[in-house]
Every structure is written in structure tokens, then in C-alpha cells.
């Protein structure tokens, strides 16, 4: 018991209260150096001599007031001006009103000396305020709802916004606008000690001034508060009855529907008092002036540019209160919004001239896009008409001839631009159908190019059979190149088997599947077999094999040297694969006279 008493006394005295306990010392470890700043051998932390191996600090159960280090949290808090806030006693309503009245007159003191014009204006405002106090309007009832919104906004603006030497806080009374300025810390301590800590919320980087404005046709008070110079903003509106009570009542800002106006903090409202469009100016307005002013304000909000955010709505029962929010906009800017619509109209007119070339380009492109299929459709229709006429003239031909040839050439006409390869049609016949073969091949080629109103190119191999192979090759190349470059899109080559063997290699250039010189053209080749007649019972595959074997005999033999300009079996196979896209037989026509086509 004695040891415990000594430890309790040790705890109560001096700095031992603040010593932080440490872990116990193990057995066999040396004692620590003195911790009390002395050179004595006293054990550290004032431990008992009977228990040197383990230190223990017993914390007392007594309340913290015993140690003398307890202070109320309210005293430790500092006011915004760095002064201790003393505890306030509860006062009666009349005493509170006196304190607030004194706070009001303390706020009314400005930091700078007013100019003569401003001093005269302040006198006018004071005279008007005294007249308002003797008006016969009944006293306003205090609002049953006390919102924290005003206190929160004012406190956040106090901490976030730097002070400005310009007076921005103004209160719009029933017929006048009064300014509320910075108040000393003594008058603000009352509200600080009673109110709850406000909630902080992020604000935009651009420092703005929030003003609460109420417009009323019945002459109600309009509260306009600015919190850049004061830590707590208390908006009071008073009205006295000349016959009854002279007591002052304080109305909370939540009784009105608030309207926030954000303006630049460095803007001085006294410079805008001369502008009739600014509603927060300091001169007196009659009720007749408020009505057109409100109408002009609504007009500005409706004609404002799209960049400004405007929110309409929330009118009171008498439609006198307008709730709006304009972001980062000074009063001078809002007064210039009336001219926004003509400027936008001229801007649209200027941009309209820039749109004309674009519209013209789109129109021409769409015309080209839609006209090209129309041209192709017309070319196909013209080809179909020509083929139907030929079918009526040459009635001795097999139906396969008309169906296959028409489908093949129509597909080529309908193919997309540029076309991948030319259309190669090979017609063959026996000796009895030589005239029909000539006439029909020429007329089919002309039908393909009938839309262009040009005649197909005609090359006859019988006229070149005895000429040199290289010469024939050069002549054929020139005839085809010149004709196809000049707008002709079809060519007919008669008696392909009569050409010199080496000269036929030129058709690699015009009949290739991928690398043809002209791909939007049609070539019609004819081969006359040595047989007297060609049976109608033969299939297309058999007819194709007959033509292939016949050309192989005509163009290759054992005496032909192997060279690049002479035909050989390998070159013939390559040529055949290019000209044999479609091989069709032609039957003789009894009504056809020699040398005259139908």
C-alpha cells in the first residue's frame, strides 16, 4: 500500500504526468541513464526501489481537471482574427438586438475615406432608411425554418476568398439598397460561439461573390450579402409600425427564395451605380422602376448567348421572385447580352458563305455518284435492246448463244469502276456458217458499244496471213491501242487462226486477267474450223476442246524454233487461258446472203 501511495504522489507532481511509458527492462540488463536531467543514480521514471527490474506507470483515474492541464475547447479555438473567444452568456431578445444593432453600425465603418459623392450618397441612404423605419408596414414574422445554407456559404467564402479593399456587400431594402461591410471580431464572436461548424464545399477557381437578391412587387426586402470581408454574414430586415411596437425583428435569409449572382471580386459596385441595368446598385428605386427592370432582366436572360448558363423558374405566388443563376458573369457583361442575338445572326450569315462551296462540292459529288450508275444502267438497257433485235434476226442460233453471251457482257457492263479485266468472247463455226460468224460477231461487238454511238474496231486475220509475224504484231498493237484510246470500247478480231503464230502473242497485252492494258473494253474473237458442219448436239465443253486442238495444230510444229517471239506449246497454253473465257458455237443462217448481214 505504501508503494502504491508513493507512485500516486509521483504521478500527481511535475512533468511526470507527460512521461510516455516504455517497455519493461528484462532481467540482467543494466539500468538506463537518468531521465530527469540530473546526475543522480535515481531510477528513471520515478519507479520504486523494490522493483528495479521493471518499470510501471500507473495512470490515475481522477478526472483531468486535477492535473491543471484541462481547458475548454472553446477557449482553445481562435477567432478568424487570432483572438480568444470568450464565453457568452444567454441574453434576452432585447439585449441580443442591441448587440446586433451595435454590430451593424460597426460594420458600416469603411476602411477608406469616402469621396464627396459617396458621402452624399450615404447620407441619402440613411435618410431613406429612417423614413423606412416609420412606414406603416406590419412587422414581418420570423421564419420558422433556420437553414444552414447562408452560414455555410458565408463561412466558406470567408475561408476561400481573399479580402478586397472594394466594398461589395450590399443589402437591398424595401425601396433602397444598403451595404453591410466588415465587422470587428468582438461582434462576430457571439454568432461563432453559438453556430455549428459549417460544411466546406469546393468552389470554382475563379473567385466570385454570391449575392442573395429577392425581387418582390409587394415591396418586400431584398437581401444581398457578400462574404468576402466578414466571417459571418447576418442579414436583417427591419420594419417598424408607427403606432405599435418599436422592437426589431430579424428575419432569416431562408424566408426568401434565393437568387445567386456571381460577379468578379475585384469589380466595384459603386462604379456601376450609374448603370440602370444593374439591379444591385446602391440608389433608391421606386416600385414603378422595379417592374420594367425585372422585365429587362428576363429579356437579357432569354437572349443570352449559349455559353452562359441560365436557369429559369421558381417564382413565388405573386410571380415577383425570379430564381436565376449566371456563372462567372459581371454586371457589365450581363448588360451587354441584349446585343447577343444580332451578333449571332451576323455570325451565322458570315458562316453561310463558307458553307456554299461545301454544299456545291457535295452536290457535284452526289451527282457524279448517282449519275454513274444511271449511265451504266442506260448502257445495259441499250445493249439489251440491241441483243433482242439480233435474236429476232438470227433465229437459227441456239438459245445458249444468246443467253450466255448476253449475261457475260451485261455482267461486264454492270461491274464497278475500274473493272478488273476485259471481257473476252470467242465465237467459232464450221465452214457452212462462215457468213453468220462474221456478221454476228461484228453486230455483238457493236451492240456492246452502242451506248457510245461508236463502231467497234475490226481486224481481219486473213489479210495478214502472209505478212511477217513481227510486222503483224506491231500493226495489231497500233490498231487496238489507237482505237481504244480514242473512245472505242469494243473490238472484233476475225479469223484468229489465220494470224502468224508469233503475232498472236500481242494478245497477252490485251487479254490478260490482271495486267491488261485496257480493262473497260470487250474483245470478240472468231475461229473458223476446217470442218464442213458443226453438229448442234455438241456441248460447250466439246466445242471448246475442238477449238483448242485446232489452234495447237495451226500455231505449233516441230520446225518452229524456241524463242521469245515465236509460238511454242507453253506460250500457246498461256494464250489460250486468256482468250477462252467463253467459247460459243455459231450455226448457219439460211436467210443470210453472202456479204450482206441481216
UniProtKB/Swiss-Prot annotation:
<keyword id="KW-0832">Ubl conjugation</keyword>
<feature type="modified residue" description="Phosphoserine">
    <location>
        <position position="135"/>
    </location>
</feature>
<dbReference type="InterPro" id="IPR008662">
    <property type="entry name" value="TOIP1/2"/>
</dbReference>
<dbReference type="GO" id="GO:0005637">
    <property type="term" value="C:nuclear inner membrane"/>
</dbReference>
<feature type="transmembrane region" description="Helical">
    <location>
        <begin position="352"/>
        <end position="372"/>
    </location>
</feature>
<keyword id="KW-0175">Coiled coil</keyword>
<keyword id="KW-0597">Phosphoprotein</keyword>
<feature type="region of interest" description="Disordered">
    <location>
        <begin position="19"/>
        <end position="254"/>
    </location>
</feature>
<feature type="modified residue" description="Phosphoserine">
    <location>
        <position position="154"/>
    </location>
</feature>
<feature type="compositionally biased region" description="Polar residues">
    <location>
        <begin position="205"/>
        <end position="214"/>
    </location>
</feature>
<keyword id="KW-1133">Transmembrane helix</keyword>
<dbReference type="InterPro" id="IPR046753">
    <property type="entry name" value="TOIP1/2_C"/>
</dbReference>
<feature type="compositionally biased region" description="Basic and acidic residues">
    <location>
        <begin position="115"/>
        <end position="124"/>
    </location>
</feature>
<feature type="compositionally biased region" description="Polar residues">
    <location>
        <begin position="277"/>
        <end position="287"/>
    </location>
</feature>
<feature type="cross-link" description="Glycyl lysine isopeptide (Lys-Gly) (interchain with G-Cter in SUMO2)">
    <location>
        <position position="323"/>
    </location>
</feature>
<feature type="topological domain" description="Nuclear">
    <location>
        <begin position="1"/>
        <end position="351"/>
    </location>
</feature>
<dbReference type="Pfam" id="PF05609">
    <property type="entry name" value="LAP1_C"/>
</dbReference>
<keyword id="KW-0325">Glycoprotein</keyword>
<feature type="modified residue" description="Phosphoserine">
    <location>
        <position position="60"/>
    </location>
</feature>
<feature type="modified residue" description="Phosphoserine">
    <location>
        <position position="227"/>
    </location>
</feature>
<dbReference type="InterPro" id="IPR038599">
    <property type="entry name" value="LAP1C-like_C_sf"/>
</dbReference>
<dbReference type="InterPro" id="IPR046754">
    <property type="entry name" value="TOIP1/2_N"/>
</dbReference>
<feature type="region of interest" description="Disordered">
    <location>
        <begin position="267"/>
        <end position="314"/>
    </location>
</feature>
<feature type="compositionally biased region" description="Basic and acidic residues">
    <location>
        <begin position="238"/>
        <end position="250"/>
    </location>
</feature>
<feature type="modified residue" description="Phosphoserine">
    <location>
        <position position="143"/>
    </location>
</feature>
<feature type="compositionally biased region" description="Basic and acidic residues">
    <location>
        <begin position="73"/>
        <end position="101"/>
    </location>
</feature>
<feature type="modified residue" description="Phosphoserine">
    <location>
        <position position="216"/>
    </location>
</feature>
<comment type="subunit">
    <text>Interacts with ATP1B4. Interacts with TOR1A (ATP-bound). Interacts with TOR1B, TOR2A and TOR3A.</text>
</comment>
<keyword id="KW-0472">Membrane</keyword>
<keyword id="KW-0539">Nucleus</keyword>
<dbReference type="GO" id="GO:0005634">
    <property type="term" value="C:nucleus"/>
</dbReference>
<protein>
    <recommendedName>
        <fullName>Torsin-1A-interacting protein 1</fullName>
    </recommendedName>
</protein>
<feature type="topological domain" description="Perinuclear space">
    <location>
        <begin position="373"/>
        <end position="598"/>
    </location>
</feature>
<feature type="region of interest" description="Interaction with TOR1A">
    <location>
        <begin position="371"/>
        <end position="598"/>
    </location>
</feature>
<feature type="compositionally biased region" description="Polar residues">
    <location>
        <begin position="300"/>
        <end position="313"/>
    </location>
</feature>
<feature type="modified residue" description="Phosphoserine">
    <location>
        <position position="230"/>
    </location>
</feature>
<dbReference type="GO" id="GO:0034504">
    <property type="term" value="P:protein localization to nucleus"/>
</dbReference>
<feature type="modified residue" description="Phosphoserine">
    <location>
        <position position="187"/>
    </location>
</feature>
<feature type="modified residue" description="Phosphoserine">
    <location>
        <position position="242"/>
    </location>
</feature>
<feature type="region of interest" description="Disordered">
    <location>
        <begin position="322"/>
        <end position="341"/>
    </location>
</feature>
<comment type="function">
    <text>Required for nuclear membrane integrity. Induces TOR1A and TOR1B ATPase activity and is required for their location on the nuclear membrane. Binds to A- and B-type lamins. Possible role in membrane attachment and assembly of the nuclear lamina.</text>
</comment>
<feature type="modified residue" description="Phosphoserine">
    <location>
        <position position="157"/>
    </location>
</feature>
Amino acid at each position: 500500500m505504501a508503494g502504491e501511495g508513493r507512485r500516486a504522489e509521483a504521478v500527481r507532481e511535475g512533468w511526470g504526468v507527460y512521461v510516455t511509458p516504455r517497455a519493461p527492462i528484462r532481467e540482467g540488463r543494466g539500468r538506463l541513464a537518468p531521465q530527469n536531467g540530473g546526475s543522480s543514480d535515481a531510477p528513471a521514471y520515478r519507479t520504486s526501489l523494490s522493483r528495479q527490474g521493471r518499470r510501471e506507470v500507473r495512470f490515475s483515474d481522477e478526472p483531468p481537471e486535477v492535473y491543471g492541464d484541462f481547458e475548454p475547447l472553446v477557449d482553445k479555438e481562435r477567432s478568424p482574427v487570432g483572438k480568444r473567444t470568450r464565453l457568452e452568456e444567454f441574453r434576452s431578445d432585447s439585449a441580443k438586438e442591441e448587440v446586433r444593432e451595435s454590430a451593424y453600425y460597426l460594420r458600416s465603418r469603411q476602411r477608406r475615406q469616402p469621396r464627396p459623392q459617396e458621402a452624399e450618397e450615404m447620407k441619402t441612404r440613411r435618410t431613406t432608411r429612417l423614413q423606412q423605419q416609420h412606414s406603416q408596414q406590419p412587422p414581418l414574422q420570423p421564419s420558422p425554418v433556420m437553414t444552414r445554407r447562408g452560414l455555410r456559404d458565408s463561412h466558406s467564402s470567408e475561408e476561400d476568398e481573399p479580402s478586397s479593399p472594394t466594398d461589395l456587400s450590399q443589402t437591398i431594402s424595401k425601396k433602397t439598397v444598403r451595404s453591410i461591410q466588415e465587422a470587428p471580431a468582438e461582434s462576430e464572436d457571439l454568432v461563432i460561439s453559438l453556430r455549428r461548424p459549417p460544411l466546406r464545399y469546393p468552389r470554382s477557381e475563379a473567385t466570385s461573390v454570391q449575392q442573395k437578391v429577392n425581387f418582390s412587387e409587394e415591396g418586400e426586402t431584398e437581401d444581398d450579402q457578400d462574404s468576402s470581408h466578414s466571417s459571418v454574414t447576418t442579414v436583417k430586415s427591419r420594419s417598424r409600425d408607427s403606432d405599435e411596437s418599436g422592437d426589431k425583428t430579424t428575419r432569416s435569409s431562408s424566408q426568401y427564395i434565393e437568387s445567386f449572382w456571381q460577379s468578379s471580386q475585384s469589380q466595384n459596385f459603386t462604379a456601376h451605380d450609374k448603370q440602370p441595368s444593374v439591379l444591385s446598385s446602391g440608389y433608391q428605386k421606386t416600385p414603378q422602376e422595379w417592374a420594367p427592370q425585372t422585365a429587362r432582366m428576363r429579356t437579357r436572360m432569354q437572349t443570352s448567348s449559349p455559353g452562359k448558363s441560365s436557369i429559369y423558374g421558381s417564382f413565388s405566388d405573386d410571380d415577383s421572385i425570379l430564381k436565376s443563376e449566371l456563372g462567372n458573369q459581371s454586371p457589365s457583361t450581363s448588360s451587354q447580352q441584349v446585343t447577343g442575338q444580332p451578333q449571332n445572326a451576323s455570325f451565322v450569315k458570315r458562316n453561310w458563305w463558307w458553307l456554299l462551296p461545301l454544299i456545291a462540292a457535295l452536290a457535284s459529288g452526289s451527282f457524279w455518284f448517282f449519275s454513274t450508275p444511271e449511265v451504266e444502267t442506260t448502257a445495259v438497257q441499250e445493249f439489251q435492246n440491241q441483243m433482242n433485235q439480233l435474236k429476232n434476226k438470227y433465229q437459227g442460233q441456239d438459245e445458249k448463244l444468246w443467253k450466255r453471251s448476253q449475261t457475260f457482257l451485261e455482267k461486264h457492263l454492270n461491274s464497278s469502276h475500274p473493272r478488273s479485266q476485259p471481257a473476252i468472247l470467242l465465237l467459232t463455226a464450221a465452214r457452212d456458217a462462215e457468213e453468220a460468224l462474221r456478221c454476228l460477231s461484228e453486230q455483238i461487238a457493236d451492240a456492246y458499244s452502242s451506248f457510245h454511238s461508236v463502231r467497234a474496231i475490226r481486224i481481219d486475220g486473213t489479210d495478214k496471213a502472209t505478212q511477217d509475224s513481227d510486222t503483224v504484231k506491231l500493226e495489231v498493237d497500233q490498231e487496238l491501242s489507237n482505237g481504244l484510246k480514242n473512245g472505242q470500247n469494243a473490238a472484233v478480231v476475225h479469223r484468229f487462226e489465220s494470224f502468224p503464230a508469233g503475232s498472236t502473242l500481242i494478245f497477252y497485252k490485251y487479254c490478260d486477267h490482271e495486267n491488261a492494258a485496257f480493262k473497260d473494253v470487250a474483245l470478240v474473237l472468231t475461229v473458223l474450223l476446217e470442218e464442213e458442219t458443226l453438229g448442234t448436239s455438241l456441248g460447250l465443253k466439246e466445242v471448246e476442246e475442238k477449238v483448242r486442238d485446232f489452234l495447237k495444230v495451226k500455231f505449233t510444229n516441230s520446225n518452229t524454233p524456241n524463242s521469245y517471239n515465236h509460238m511454242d506449246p507453253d506460250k500457246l497454253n498461256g494464250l489460250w487461258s486468256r482468250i477462252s473465257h467463253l467459247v460459243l458455237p455459231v450455226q448457219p443462217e439460211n436467210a443470210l446472203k453472202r456479204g450482206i448481214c441481216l
